[in-house]
Amino acid sequence: MKGRFFSFEGPDGAGKTTMITKLESFLREKGFDVLLTREPGGVRIAEEIRSIILNPKHTEMDGRTEALLYAAARRQHLLEKIIPAIKAGKIVLCDRFVDSSLAYQGFARGLGIDEILQINQFAIDGFFPSLTIYFDIDPKIGLERIQKNKQREINRLDMESLSFHYKVREGYLKIAERFSDRIIVIDASKPVDEVFAMTIAAVMDQIEGR
């Protein structure tokens, strides 16, 4: 079977990670060979970069530094883990990818979507997912979910203002409109079962070539 690459995006607290975990189980039950991974991280070097980026103590980090660190982690992750898995015929489910950088650093940080895209084009050399699912939710609801989740570790980006998180969402919606051939938007405020059904439908359409 031909390998596939799917990425999943959303503001903090959209339930993205929960959906990906459920999707992984669903696909495995169907007999697919699945790799679940995340960004920043996924491989040792990228995980070390992740610890630097998300450390709550690093409040002085410049936006461009942040963007470059994400791109560096992404490059290593792609070469070391994602591409080999796709070549081996696996279905790769990635919790965040390029679009996170476009929304967070490009739009919310005000560095420019095109500028951040250019940095990432250099990092990934044109290797985009075949499909990206963006889980959309009001940031206020998302942050309330995070605060209720006692098991989730609070990172540096969680500590940003509510207005920043609204900018992130606005950035995502602009990106989804611009790259509508690759990105689909799912309303994550709907019941979990409904969101999951839409997620499965979108992924299976790609896998089965519908």
UniProtKB/Swiss-Prot annotation:
Disulfide bonds: none annotated. It catalyses: dTMP + ATP = dTDP + ADP. CDD domains: TMPK (cd01672). Keywords: ATP-binding, Kinase, Nucleotide biosynthesis, Nucleotide-binding, Transferase. InterPro entries: P-loop_NTPase, Thymidylate_kin-like_dom, Thymidylate_kin_CS, Thymidylate_kinase. Its EC number is 2.7.4.9. One of its GO terms (biological process) is dUDP biosynthetic process. Pfam families: Thymidylate_kin. It comes from the Bacteria. One of its GO terms (molecular function) is dTMP kinase activity. ATP binds at G10, P11, D12, G13, A14, G15, K16, T17. GO terms for cellular component: cytosol. Phosphorylation of dTMP to form dTDP in both de novo and salvage pathways of dTTP synthesis. PANTHER family: THYMIDYLATE KINASE (PTHR10344), UMP-CMP KINASE 2, MITOCHONDRIAL (PTHR10344:SF4). Belongs to the thymidylate kinase family. This is Thymidylate kinase.
